[in-house]
Amino acid sequence: MSVTNAEAHQIAREKGVSGPLYLIVKYTAALVFRILCGFTASGKENVPAKGPVVIVPNHKSFWDPFFVAIVLRRPVHFMGKAEHFDGPMAPFFLRLGAFPVRRGASDEEALETARAILRRGDALALFPEGTRVREEGLGTAKRGAARLAIEAGAPLVPTTITGTEKRRWPLPRKVRMVFGTPVPVEGLEATPEDAALAIGQAWPQVEQEYARWQARPGVIVAGAAAIGLGALVVSKRRKK
């Protein structure tokens, strides 16, 4: 059963996550990912157990939302491309906490749904880069997530994801997540200047952790192996 854009947002605002469905999918996905690649997560205590919170991860892969969701105890809501909600799977995605966003312009329906989720005291994950970044390194963080957090009085939790870059299954290395120090928004106003200030405190944590992990020797070898150069790198190391 397909739904219209308006119906999708109404479901997301009024019904939210289906607890039993969310748990079934979460634990099934966790089992599959552990078999295929493995994953670790640190700093989960930085995500409040209740109350509104905006999680701001970097975005390298379609699978990033799944990894964030399976390591946290509380359900997490995500925006997804509107095209994913055009078919019969739309009700399923909506009850898992996803909701549509139309790209290319400010989508007021999606923004209002995000506000409703935070007013309800739920967790919302937004990718500040706006889309998947396929190039090396990270993209520039936009202010929208911080502005929503300020409006809701919700802390920003910077989150670093490594191991999903340009990979197909099976992943050559484990996926690793680090939930950083929350950035409080008390005393800030929902202005472009204050939103820039808030994301400017959160995003450097992601950049620094991502750069630190990418610089590890084992990560360099794994990345080279993924493009067929691993044997050459390892051979050179053995000769030293």
Positions of predicted regions on the chain:
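Glycine-rich helix-loop-beta junction characteristic of Rossmann-like nucleotide cofactor-binding loops
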Residues: 44-48
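Non-catalytic C-terminal accessory region of glycerolipid acyltransferases
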Residues: 2-21, 109-240
